[in-house]
């Protein structure tokens, strides 16, 4: 709770008067240069997977993305009222006698039983398991395929993202051919592109808006 109080206090100071939030704002300012690093393929496939997707991505999300200060204050209130309990790391869940048993190896004395379990985490992008009927039909008919990383030692990694031409955003079919008239942009391409869920920022030539304009121009050219 001390961490939450400090986090909310720093957030309320904003990026103009808060030294911590001002420093973290640099990560937001660096988004476009980082995107260019990804888009131009300046990282090897192994570096892209191990360093960028698995290490930097989670660190960047933790430092520069999060809820507004109001939500942190609300969480503190719920914790203080005993309505919410933050579990120790390494949670494990088992079904026993019609209930869910929650335990963690980091604290052997901790144990909680519950009748209901709600999966509330945001799932990773994974086109093959997506519930979207259009995506499934495109994959089934060969009009689309998932972006695959070619790693060292002949290893491969399925990113789960829909493969697109990074320059035009045109959908790539099973043979890697761009298809005129079919475009994909946004969350389904996370892994080919980076941070596709970020909202446009004011007073900058935002990547999301530039990409939307580029797609429209390509459509008119076709």
Residue ranges of each PLM-predicted region?
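Flavin (primarily FAD) cofactor-binding/catalytic cores of flavoenzymes
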Residues: 1-220
């Amino acid at each position: 709770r001390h961490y939450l109080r400090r986090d909310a206090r720093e957030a309320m100071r904003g990026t103009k008067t808060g030294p911590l939030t001002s420093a973290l704002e640099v990560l937001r300012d660096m988004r476009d240069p980082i995107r260019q690093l990804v888009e131009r393929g300046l990282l090897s496939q192994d570096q892209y997977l191990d360093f960028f997707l698995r290490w930097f991505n989670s660190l960047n999300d933790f430092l520069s993305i999060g809820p507004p200060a109001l939500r942190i204050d609300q969480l503190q209130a719920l914790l203080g009222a005993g309505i919410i309990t933050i579990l120790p790391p390494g949670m494990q869940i088992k079904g026993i006698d019609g209930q869910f048993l929650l335990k963690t190896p980091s604290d052997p004395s901790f144990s909680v039983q519950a009748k209901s379990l709600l999966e509330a985490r945001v799932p990773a992008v994974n086109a093959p398991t997506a519930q979207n009927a259009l995506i499934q039909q495109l994959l089934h008919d060969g009009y689309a395929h998932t972006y695959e990383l070619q790693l060292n030692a002949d290893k491969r990694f399925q990113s789960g993202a829909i493969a697109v031409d990074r320059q035009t955003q045109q959908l790539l079919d099973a043979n890697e051919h761009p298809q005129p008239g079919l475009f994909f942009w946004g969350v389904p391409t996370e892994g080919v592109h980076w941070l596709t869920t970020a909202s446009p920022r004011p007073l900058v030539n935002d990547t999301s808006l530039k990409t939307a304009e580029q797609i429209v121009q390509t459509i008119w050219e076709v």
